[in-house]
Amino acid sequence: GDEGGLKINKLGTKEWLKTKAKVKKNLREVAKELIELYAKREKAQGYAFPKDTPWQTQFEDSFPYQETDDQLRCIDEVKKDMEMDKPMDRLLCGDVGYGKTEVAIRAAFKAVMGGKQVAYLAPTTVLAEQQYKEFKDRMNNFGVKVEVLNRFRTPKQQKEIIKRLKLGEVDIIVGTHRILSEDVEFKDL
């Protein structure tokens, strides 16, 4: 069958040498783009968040479960990244139920304590609602204002949340791709 336009060449033929040269050229272009991207990242200035406050410690102590060693290591690494004046470039991966949300919650709290707003993107409306409740429950005693933006909110509610977000009256917004819409503006993300 047709393999999507792939063509097999016999080694050593003119077609093989031509294909090999084309691939080498493309690889050089990709390598050049990657080098330029990493150079740009290296020069980029980020926002250096302050060291943990006593409230951060109190907030973290309010976690009702025992953290795993991996969770504690990830939390420490993320917070160290946040305290650097370079944009963070980190991907956190883990199976369901292994504490990724708590890592995000602590980073979000640190960001809010550092005077910034936080946008937390969830892949589904149901997950956005669950994460919103978890963020809200964890932040409730610390005066952090958390809202959710998704299709479960009426257009009127969405408009009000967006207005408050732009005014800086919302610290953390949890939502689906809706939070990426052009009408969603932040005071200081």
Model-inferred region functions:
Residues 83-94, 102, 115-117, 170:
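Pre-Walker A (Motif I) flank of P-loop NTPase domains
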Residues 99:
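Conserved glycine(s) of the Walker
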Residues 152-173, 180-189:
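Conserved motor-coupling elements within RecA-like helicase/translocase cores
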Residues 1-70:
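Upstream accessory/linker segments immediately N-terminal to the RecA-like ATPase cores of bacterial MutS
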Residues 64-88, 102-103:
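N-terminal pre-P-loop "Q-motif" helix
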Residues 71, 96, 174:
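Conserved hydrophobic/aromatic pocket- or pore-lining residues that grip, position, or stack substrates
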Residues 89, 103-132, 140-145:
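Conserved SF1/SF2 helicase motif Ia
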Residues 125-130, 137, 148-157:
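AAA+/P-loop NTPase substrate/partner-engagement loops
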